[in-house]
């Protein structure tokens, strides 16, 4: 028989047609699970480094305009006026006259039972509410400086007179309250201070960590700052911690940090930690001051009402909740301005996010071992702490198992999330107050809703103005923050090649 020319064998076809293993899996064999044989053991092959396959695009940030923000003194003045208005409303809800009084009764000639009001308590509450305004006034006068010795002396004397007057009024009201009320009622006067001490005095280390670095770009600056951790976070006695916390509490002009668009993953994580500590401190200030204001404005007057005095408990408690929500929104708007939220958004864009995957999925996809010195692109699979994760952001330097990094990215990767939440809260309050105003039949309900609505309209106007301007600003195409990121790739150690 004539011999046929046989073609290449199946084994030769598979060897010549299929690409190399290194091309299929890239850097996965050396940095992850790689390929495995039938026995389950990994096949060790020389593969290129992980960063040869990682080319994340540059992080792009939008440029937002500088929106006007109320000054510290102006905001404290408006906030103090608002608290006085809601305090007056609460006294109307408690001490309004009722219809069953006889005509010849003294209270029937007036709208309020003025003879039942404790004026010492009202003066004490007013002084406590004015503490931030007084300190803001002193701080602004101190920042202005003194042009001459006479001006400096007058400034010192005015500060001394103002603080002495506030202290004297506070002591005078406390002495008279001690004479006319029981010890149980007087305990309500200092209850917020009992919450203040453990809340602020025992958590100063995280605040001191914020002062380690001002978001520097160079590695050497971070190393120098890290060497000073011991000196900044050394143990202090209780009195010094209390004085520092009180100083921070009264100091309302908290500076806004800056964003440096760092290239190193360590610097990005360090910036996120500093911003996270600063954000937690601001939220703590917002919660404490809003609860403090609502407590002294709406709750403390109820504690000193005589047992024979009738008032609408449901309406007074509803007023308490409204005061707390409005104070929370006002303080949040002041302490978390649009520039600060944009700073958090930029840092979250550099941080990235990891999604945890179930075992068994993506078993044939290339996987890598997570490295803290690598910037991971979107969609890459890594293994960390015996778990599989997938990169979700354009840049990903977050620790996959760190829940605080995931929460930070969730809150701030959308720049308008905080602003939309505040608008939703304030809008819901205004809609409910309008509904209550339409349904109200008593004069005190109508007056209280009308006065509070005027204050809420101003807050909602500022929020909607910022939302419209920022919404249009973020809709424009982003610009690359640093052209060096597109020209100089990163090595496996996080440095420029």
From Swiss-Prot:
Coiled coil: none annotated. One of its GO terms (cellular component) is endoplasmic reticulum membrane. Glycans are attached at residues 31, 39, 251. It is found in: Endoplasmic reticulum membrane. It is a multi-pass membrane protein. Keywords: Autophagy, Endoplasmic reticulum, Glycoprotein, Membrane, Transmembrane, Transmembrane helix. The chain crosses the membrane at residues 72-92, 110-130, 155-175, 182-202, 285-305, 317-337, 418-438, 444-464. It holds the Pfam family Tmp39. The keyword Endoplasmic reticulum applies. GO terms for biological process: autophagy; negative regulation of autophagosome assembly; negative regulation of autophagosome maturation; positive regulation of viral genome replication. It comes from the Eukaryota. Belongs to the TMEM39 family. Regulates autophagy by controlling the spatial distribution and levels of the intracellular phosphatidylinositol 4-phosphate (PtdIns(4)P) pools. Modulates (PtdIns(4)P) levels by regulating the ER-to-Golgi trafficking of the phosphatidylinositide phosphatase SACM1L. Interacts with SACM1L, SEC23A and SEC24A. This is Transmembrane protein 39A. The lineage of its organism: Eukaryota, Metazoa, Chordata, Craniata, Vertebrata. The gene is Tmem39a.
